[in-house]
Curated annotation (Swiss-Prot):
It comes from Streptomyces coelicolor (strain ATCC BAA-471 / A3(2) / M145). It is found in: Cytoplasm. InterPro entries: UDG_fam1 (IPR002043), Ura-DNA_Glyclase_AS (IPR018085), Uracil-DNA_glycosylase-like (IPR005122), Uracil-DNA_glycosylase-like_sf (IPR036895). This is Uracil-DNA glycosylase 1. Pfam families: UDG. PANTHER family: URACIL-DNA GLYCOSYLASE. Its EC number is 3.2.2.27. The gene is ung1. Keywords: Cytoplasm, DNA damage, DNA repair, Hydrolase.
């Protein structure tokens, strides 16, 4: 079966931005089909693998980079750190993100872990690797997704529009050179294993808004229902 054109599976602006890696996206699709053929599955569900690229490319004003999807079945939804509304309990990283959101902006605890409202505010929730194997963190790291997501970041940086990046953890911080002169906020990862080493108290949400306004952009409304 011939691969579907990019403009049928991602937003039009992203289709153009990702054109240099269209062949790599096709190769990753073949890799995932081979996994299924070999009796292995992957996360998130196929329809959500490229979900981050379904929001308008031109509207992105904050980039939050994750490592790879949650490995717990039922958790990964194609947006870094987000889960479906019905997921309980919340992943530890997300619990800590919400704790910092409250400390930073005095916002109440959200009703669930669905971060989709942030994407409507122009926040791109992007994992470096877009798939993983169930119960195996980082299983697909180094398999080829990095070429795709790094092109996405380079394309965002080349737009010449106000954007702030929030880089949590070493994997995300390694992407700093791709951002050129655009501002980036760096801290420890919100994982329970590292949040006490610089994530708590980093105030990424208010600082991102301050930087956006300094660049002439509009602040993000970080409230969640």
């Amino acid at each position: 079966m011939a691969p579907r054109p990019l403009n049928e599976i991602v937003e039009a602006g992203w289709a153009k931005a990702l054109e240099p890696v269209a062949g790599q996206i096709t190769s990753m699709g073949e890799f995932l089909r081979a996994e299924i053929a070999a009796g292995r599955t992957y996360l998130p569900a196929g329809a959500n693998v490229l979900r981050a690229f379904q929001q308008p490319f031109d509207d992105v004003r904050v980039l939050i980079v994750g490592q790879d999807p949650y490995p717990t079945p039922g958790h990964a939804v194609g947006l870094s750190f987000s889960v479906a509304p019905e997921v309980r309990p919340l992943p530890g990283s997300l619990v800590n993100i919400f704790r910092e959101l409250n400390t930073d902006l005095n916002l109440p605890q959200p009703a669930n872990g669905d971060l989709t409202p942030w994407t409507r505010q122009g926040v791109l929730l992007l994992n470096r690797a877009l798939t993983t194997a169930p119960r195996k963190p980082a299983a697909h790291r180094g398999k080829g997704w990095e070429e795709v997501t790094e092109q996405a970041i380079r394309a965002l940086a080349a737009r010449g529009k106000p954007m702030v990046s929030i880089l949590w953890g070493r994997d995300a911080r390694n992407l700093r050179p791709l951002l050129g002169d655009l501002p980036a906020l760096e801290s420890a990862h919100p994982s329970p294993m590292s949040a006490d080493r610089g994530f708590f108290g980093s105030r990424p949400f208010s600082r991102a808004n301050d930087l956006l306004m300094r660049l002439g952009g509009q602040p993000v409304d970080w409230r969640l229902p």
